[in-house]
Amino acid sequence: MKTKEMRDMTNAELDQRLAELKGELFNLRFQLATGQLENPLRIRNVRKDIARAKTIIRENELKQARA
């Protein structure tokens, strides 16, 4: 998911997306441990998506605090 698309989401949607990404990361790590993971690069991409979501959530919090 692109950063621009994430910025258009509400905080509730971002929280939901963050929970989905954390669950996906858990499953990917489990697959890696059992040797079933086909694309190890997916772990890195999911971690970066989690960081993007957290960053945007924090930006929104700071924006609301200033207002």
Curated annotation (Swiss-Prot):
One of its GO terms (molecular function) is structural constituent of ribosome. The keyword Ribonucleoprotein applies. Keywords: Ribonucleoprotein, Ribosomal protein. It holds the Pfam family Ribosomal_L29. InterPro entries: Ribosomal_protein_uL29, Ribosomal_uL29, Ribosomal_uL29_CS, Ribosomal_uL29_sf. GO terms for biological process: translation. It comes from the Bacteria. Coiled coil: none annotated. One of its GO terms (cellular component) is cytosolic large ribosomal subunit. Gene3D superfamilies: 1.10.287.310. Belongs to the universal ribosomal protein uL29 family. This is Large ribosomal subunit protein uL29.
